[in-house]
């Protein structure tokens, strides 16, 4: 789809065409190679912003650490991370004064969450640094490995299944003199193939035990692995993002829970809400400033940009904030919340894979792993890389760089928002004690500032005061990138405000089209996206109709399912034509079986199977919705499925779509090539977890089951459930006596086997 006809029909005035300037059509840029360079940039920049702080050495790991807190006040406009503790605490106190009880209430809410959260909360999320294997893994696997290692080292509090107990193990693990872990490795040997008589490389996977002393373990526990952020639009340079290990994640989760609870109560916070709710919140703040500035005052709005928000934040400052917010709370709760910032003050950044060298003349390629950067001869590197390595060398320990100041991207979005809002809160007249006052919006590092004053001098004074207040808290408003307008026109988190929010339609462009999950899901997602944009993004009826036609065309080309009466020849057309001729009611065929499209903008909310059900031939219905069809590996489908949409801006969104299980809801099989690598051991573990979980869910089909509380194991829970179900089925005559006896016998056998084990 190279045309973008949507823009012709949007019911928009000219200023809304802002969306056409966004870099959102076409594929986003991806990074290739290693992120080592970007990570070194981050580490070096962060230290540069705090360079006038105090150096200390961590007694446990020997890592050099820079502490900029309460450092010299800035004399110029350069970004700096010298936040002043007393200023931060005062800002918190004023925030509490204007929102009585806010911290108290949020602490109470959070305490409940802390006591109820299960450890499987940590399985959510994508790639996670797995400290046992020293590389990234899916979150569930990384958690399983961590728990396995903990148990084999005598840490068993986690067996209760509560997250807080797992965190007790984490704390204890840090006091241990050594930790024993299992690592995977592979052996290669050359053997002759019996059939082809050629030499082949045979790989076997081995597991071996390895002991980590206290120092090595601590370094791993405090390590954040780094990667390059992919698919970032509108930027020339890539940047590094971090993924923390399992030791840090649980603590961060609780801190963010508290901060989220506070943000929900702050009218200036753009988190944790999104979409239309966020727009309503923003519109309220703007309305308040406009109504109060009608006659005597003028009002201006800054579309703000902060320089390197994360790299100037400081975990020590977050510790001060948490200490203040939880000051009347029980000791255990304060301790749990203070661990995350303490760990971040001692964090280590893993430098990634290292550098790739190739010699054109000798056709050689070699990888220099990050561990070698500490003592390799720098003559092989170009100037810029050489400077980076020289700068970072004093900070290196075992291929990781000590990074005490700064926060990595996305770790404490909610908490840093609270910090930002505390400055916006200081703009009330009772605090500025002068003729100007301000208010605004904050969402992580993005902000909009609305300043009111009797005249232009007042506006200027207000902005200056805001700028200087920010500096005291380690926030650096960029004078180059922020711009000011009469209130009524600004941008905040890619929402454009012009006397009301303008639909920034181009943001949604990437989600139009065929997702590539399977025929059933893709059809459903495609029409849902169009429906959602009619509701939320000013997609007009004419355009929606056109988008729908383009989508159906795109869909047919993707799955080669052109209508049965078409002339287009594809690999599938022979089968589709045969089906077309055999079918009495051709309107009943799904589009993916060569049927006509019955969707229009009025019925987008109805799944295609339901839309056509009454029109289908009976035998077609039978084939389409037959769970015993041997050609389809079925996934149990809830009535609502979630697709992960990648919007142009911000994190991946979950989008719900209606799912009707048919023979088109197939799941592709896993690629085989992974089976020959050292990942294989991990893959087998993962499949085992998968099987256990699937089995468990068969016994407890409702997705809302209460987890078995207490000490009963999964097996015991399933056996007792099987017995109850069997008895009910037998008594209601659904199963015969023989079947009932057999089920009971199997249950007893399972219990017997468990006892013997």
From Swiss-Prot:
Residues 53-82 are annotated as: Disordered. Disulfide bonds: none annotated. Residues 286-483 form the RdRp catalytic domain. Keywords: Eukaryotic host gene expression shutoff by virus, Eukaryotic host transcription shutoff by virus, Host cytoplasm, Host gene expression shutoff by virus, Host nucleus, Host-virus interaction, Inhibition of host RNA polymerase II by virus, Nucleotide-binding, Nucleotidyltransferase, Phosphoprotein, RNA-directed RNA polymerase, Transferase, Viral RNA replication, Viral transcription. Its EC number is 2.7.7.48. It catalyses: RNA(n) + a ribonucleoside 5'-triphosphate = RNA(n+1) + diphosphate. PROSITE patterns: RDRP_SSRNA_NEG_SEG. GO terms for molecular function: nucleotide binding; RNA binding; RNA-directed RNA polymerase activity. Pfam families: Flu_PB1. It is found in: Host nucleus; Host cytoplasm. A motif (Nuclear localization signal) lies at residues 187-195, 203-216. Belongs to the influenza viruses polymerase PB1 family. RNA-dependent RNA polymerase which is responsible for replication and transcription of virus RNA segments. The transcription of viral mRNAs occurs by a unique mechanism called cap-snatching. 5' methylated caps of cellular mRNAs are cleaved after 10-13 nucleotides by PA. In turn, these short capped RNAs are used as primers by PB1 for transcription of viral mRNAs. During virus replication, PB1 initiates RNA synthesis and copy vRNA into complementary RNA (cRNA) which in turn serves as a template for the production of more vRNAs. This is RNA-directed RNA polymerase catalytic subunit. It comes from Influenza A virus (strain A/USA:Iowa/1943 H1N1).
């Amino acid at each position: 789809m190279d045309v973008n006809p949507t823009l012709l029909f949007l019911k928009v005035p000219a200023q809304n065409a802002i969306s056409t300037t966004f870099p959102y059509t076409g594929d986003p840029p991806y990074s290739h190679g290693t992120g080592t360079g970007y990570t070194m940039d981050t580490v070096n920049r962060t230290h540069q912003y705090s360079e006038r702080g105090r150096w200390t050495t961590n007694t446990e790991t020997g890592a050099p650490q820079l502490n900029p807190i309460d450092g010299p006040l800035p004399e110029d406009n350069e970004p700096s991370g010298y936040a002043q503790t007393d200023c931060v605490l005062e800002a918190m106190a004023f925030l509490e004064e204007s929102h009585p009880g806010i911290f108290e209430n949020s602490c109470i809410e959070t305490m409940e969450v802390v006591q109820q959260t299960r450890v499987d909360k940590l399985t959510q999320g994508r790639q996670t640094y797995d400290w046992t294997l020293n590389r990234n893994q899916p979150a569930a696997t990384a958690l399983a490995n961590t728990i396995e290692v903990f148990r084999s080292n005598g840490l068993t509090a986690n067996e209760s299944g509560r997250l807080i107990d797992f965190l007790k193990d984490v704390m204890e693990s840090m006091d241990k003199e050594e930790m024993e872990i299992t690592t995977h490795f592979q052996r290669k040997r050359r053997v002759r193939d019996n059939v082809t008589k050629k030499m082949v490389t045979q790989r076997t996977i081995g597991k071996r035990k390895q002991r980590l002393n206290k120092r090595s373990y601590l370094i791993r526990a405090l390590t954040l692995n780094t990667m390059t952020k992919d698919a970032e639009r509108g930027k020339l340079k890539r940047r590094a993002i971090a993924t923390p290990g399992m030791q840090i994640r649980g603590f961060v989760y609780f801190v963010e829970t508290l901060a989220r609870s506070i943000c929900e109560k702050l009218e200036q916070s753009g988190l944790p809400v999104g979409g239309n709710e966020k727009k309503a919140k923003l519109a309220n703040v703007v309305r308040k400033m406009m109504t109060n500035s009608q006659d005597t005052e003028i009002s201006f709005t800054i579309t703000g940009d902060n320089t390197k928000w994360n790299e100037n934040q400081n975990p020590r400052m977050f510790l001060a904030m948490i200490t203040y917010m939880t000051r009347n709370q029980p000791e255990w709760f304060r301790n749990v919340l203070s661990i995350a910032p303490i760990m971040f003050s001692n964090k280590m950044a893993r430098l990634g894979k290292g550098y790739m060298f190739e010699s054109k003349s000798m056709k050689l390629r070699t990888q220099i792993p990050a561990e070698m950067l500490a003592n390799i001869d720098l003559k092989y590197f170009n100037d810029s890389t050489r400077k980076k390595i020289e700068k970072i060398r004093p900070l290196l320990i075992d291929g990781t760089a000590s990074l005490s100041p700064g926060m990595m991207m996305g770790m404490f979005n909610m908490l840093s928002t609270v910090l930002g809002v505390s400055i916006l809160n200081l703009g009330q007249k009772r605090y500025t004690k002068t003729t100007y006052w301000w208010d605004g919006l904050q969402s992580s590092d993005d902000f909009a500032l609305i300043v009111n004053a009797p005249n232009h001098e007042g506006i200027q004074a207000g902005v200056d005061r805001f700028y200087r207040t920010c500096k005291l808290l380690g926030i650096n408003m960029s004078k180059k990138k922020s711009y000011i307008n009469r209130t009524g026109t600004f941008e905040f988190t890619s929402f454009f405000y012009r006397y009301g929010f303008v639909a920034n339609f181009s943001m949604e462009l990437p989600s139009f089209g065929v997702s590539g999950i399977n025929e059933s899901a893709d059809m459903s997602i495609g029409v849902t996206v169009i429906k959602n944009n009619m509701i939320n993004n000013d997609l007009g009826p004419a355009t929606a109709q056109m988008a729908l036609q383009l989508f159906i065309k795109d869909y047919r080309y993707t799955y080669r399912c052109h209508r049965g009466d078409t002339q287009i020849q594809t690999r599938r057309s022979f089968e589709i034509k045969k089906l077309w001729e055999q079918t009495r009611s051709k309107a009943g065929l799904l589009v993916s079986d060569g049927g006509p499209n019955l969707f229009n903008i009025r019925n987008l909310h109805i799944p295609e199977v339901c839309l056509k059900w009454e029109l289908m031939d009976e035998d077609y219905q039978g084939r389409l919705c037959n769970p015993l069809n041997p050609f389809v590996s079925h996934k149990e489908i809830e009535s609502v499925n979630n697709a992960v949409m990648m919007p142009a801006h911000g994190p991946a969104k979950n989008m719900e779509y209606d799912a009707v299980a048919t023979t088109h809801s197939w799941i592709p099989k896993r690629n085989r090539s992974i089976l020959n690598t050292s990942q294989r051991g991990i893959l087998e573990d993962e499949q085992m977890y998968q099987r256990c979980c699937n089995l468990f869910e068969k016994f407890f089909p409702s997705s809302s089951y209460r987890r078995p509380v207490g000490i009963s194991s999964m097996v015991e829970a399933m056996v007792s459930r099987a017995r109850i179900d069997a008895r009910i089925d037998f008594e209601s005559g659904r199963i015969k006596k023989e079947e009932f006896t057999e089920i009971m016998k199997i249950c007893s056998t399972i219990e017997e086997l468990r006892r013997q084990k």
